[in-house]
């Protein structure tokens, strides 16, 4: 086991604060509409240019072990805020730095760190309640566009694209971000349910231009096992042929003679069919088959419920207006399922989301809700170079998270004003002793810091602007993008309540931990031994004989 350095008290805290400052100073230059870029070196390929706080934070690793501990703790603030709210990482870092900086002064003056922490917690709880009070729900797509634009560093086109996507697929719909092929951003909307399984044989293709299978008003057969024997399928195929409509088979797999017979019938024009594998794996596959059954008004043919393929009738089959199958995707448009049954299924999945413990499960369940309730929108990000594309894509993803947060918990005035106004709820607070009062003061000071930093990054005098904004009331604030004072909500400078709340809570949580730290243990740096001398050129003796 390697030897450890154990550092106590002020010496440990001072080193950790140095680390906090190095990381926070690198991150906070990106805050606000006039925030600067940070260039990140890559071990291969060109450098990455970013204005995303969490991307900058993740890159920072300091040589000094104690400084690095401080930096890593603040990095945790940024990444936790990003995970919970999807945005607000820079604001959280600025708040954490301020709470640590102010708090350390009081700790150095001999105040009790535990009481400081209690004061900080009390102030944060009061501020969060105040933020919830002033929060307004997002009602219009204009507000959604404004939130998206602010989060994407005042890029209005990104905000508009996201608002348009939400209009098309609903607030529950899936919106994904992909690399575009042109210079302009594009929005592609897939209505209906899409899942990532394509045709099992290219011989099913009936639209050679698009290389897809198009089935108009088809029946849908859902089976949870493999189909390899054509004899099992014959009864249902005959019934479908009599009805004169196409058939899509969704099963675990269709292989051997069953697939060959379907292909031959398709080529000869006897029966228009297509087959795809069921989406997902294991229990998720069963659940998704059930989703498709409810969407199309059919039944999953499973031995568990006493149904077999040879006894299946047309009543067991689902129906849809149109189905399009590509090489990798299948889209079911306008399923014939009962609206009440679909709504019931969505409620059931939402209940599962509430109980889900892992982020992965939650994400997959949300996708299922979106596929049943709305549709899928793809924002294709356009840019001139790959470096610009990466940077823009990161901003679009941030904006997307911010708009989802705004839909979830509502909006507050942006530009650091919501936190500044929430100070009113704290200023009357008193703790149980002077040390707790000091903790409350720490938060009061920290809550004006985001506005100060936004103004500094815009090249203005922070104290003058903060004083003027404090004189105003309500939504009155400073719009750093235009350099004007006024009603920020009317100007479209909005922040999601969830982002502001999460940033403050996470910053206070980690900063309090640091204030109550009294000992740091780190590995002793290894002494680097001097490199060995290179081997000499032997056999060079006897120079005299050469003279």
Swiss-Prot record:
Location of the protein in the cell: Cytoplasm
Record-stated family: Belongs to the chaperonin (HSP60) family.
GO process terms (BP): protein refolding
Organism: Cupriavidus pinatubonensis (strain JMP 134 / LMG 1197) (Cupriavidus necator (strain JMP 134))
GO CC annotation, single: cytoplasm
Cited Pfam families: Cpn60_TCP1 (PF00118)
Protein name: Chaperonin GroEL
Cross-referenced InterPro entries: Chaperonin_Cpn60_CS, Cpn60/GroEL, Cpn60/GroEL/TCP-1, GroEL-like_apical_dom_sf, GROEL-like_equatorial_sf, TCP-1-like_intermed_sf
């Amino acid at each position: 086991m390697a030897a450890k350095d154990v550092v106590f008290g002020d010496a440990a805290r001072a080193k950790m604060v140095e680390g906090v400052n190095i990381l926070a100073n690198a991150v906070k230059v990106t805050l606000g509409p006039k925030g600067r870029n940070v260039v990140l070196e890559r071990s291969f390929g060109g450098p990455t240019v970013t204005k995303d706080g969490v991307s900058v934070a993740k890159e920072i690793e300091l040589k000094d072990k104690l400084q690095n501990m401080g930096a890593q703790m603040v990095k945790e603030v940024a990444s936790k805020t990003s995970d919970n709210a999807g945005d607000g990482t820079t604001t959280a870092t600025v708040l954490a730095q301020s709470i640590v900086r102010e708090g350390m002064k009081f700790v150095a003056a001999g105040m009790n760190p535990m009481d400081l922490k209690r004061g900080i917690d009390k102030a944060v709880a009061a501020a969060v309640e105040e933020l919830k009070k002033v929060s307004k729900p997002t009602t219009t797509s204009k507000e959604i566009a404004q939130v998206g634009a602010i989060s994407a560093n005042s890029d209005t086109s990104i905000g508009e694209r996201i608002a348009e996507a939400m209009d098309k697929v609903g607030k529950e719909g899936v919106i994904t971000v992909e690399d575009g092929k042109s210079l302009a951003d594009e929005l592609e909307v897939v209505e209906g349910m899409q899942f990532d399984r394509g045709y099992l044989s290219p011989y099913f293709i009936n639209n050679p231009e698009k290389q897809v299978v198009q089935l108009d008003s088809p029946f849908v057969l859902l089976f949870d096992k493999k189909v390899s024997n054509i004899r099992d399928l014959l009864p249902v195929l005959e019934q479908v042929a009599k009805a004169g409509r196409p058939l899509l088979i969704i099963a675990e797999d269709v292989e051997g003679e069953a697939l060959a017979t379907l292909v031959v019938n398709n080529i000869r024009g006897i029966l228009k069919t297509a087959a795809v594998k069921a989406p997902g794996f294991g229990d998720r596959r069963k659940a998704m088959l059930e989703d498709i059954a409810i969407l199309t008004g059919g039944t999953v043919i499973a031995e568990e419920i006493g149904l077999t393929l040879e006894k299946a009738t047309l009543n067991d089959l689902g129906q849809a207006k149109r189905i399009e199958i590509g090489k990798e995707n299948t889209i079911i448009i306008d399923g014939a399922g009962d609206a009440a049954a679909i709504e019931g299924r969505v409620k059931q999945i939402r209940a599962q989301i509430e109980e889900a413990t892992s982020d992965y499960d939650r994400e997959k369940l949300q996708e299922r809700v979106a596929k049943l309730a709305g549709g899928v929108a793809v924002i294709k990000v356009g840019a001139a170079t790959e470096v610009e594309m990466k940077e823009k894509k990161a901003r679009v993803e941030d904006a997307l998270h911010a708009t989802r947060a705004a839909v979830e918990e509502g909006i507050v005035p942006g530009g650091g004003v919501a936190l500044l106004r929430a100070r009113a709820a704290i200023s009357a607070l008193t703790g149980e002793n002077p040390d707790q009062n000091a903790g409350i003061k720490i938060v009061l000071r920290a809550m004006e810091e985001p506005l100060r930093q936004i103004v500094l990054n815009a090249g203005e005098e922070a104290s003058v602007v903060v004083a003027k904004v404090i004189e105003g009331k309500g939504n009155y604030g400073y719009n750093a993008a235009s350099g004007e004072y006024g009603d920020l909500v009317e100007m479209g400078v909005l922040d999601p309540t969830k982002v502001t709340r999460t940033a403050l809570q996470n910053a206070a949580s980690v900063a309090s931990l640091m204030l109550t730290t009294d000992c740091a243990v780190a590995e002793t740096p290894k002494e680097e031994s001097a490199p060995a001398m290179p081997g000499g050129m032997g056999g060079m003796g006897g120079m005299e004989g050469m003279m």
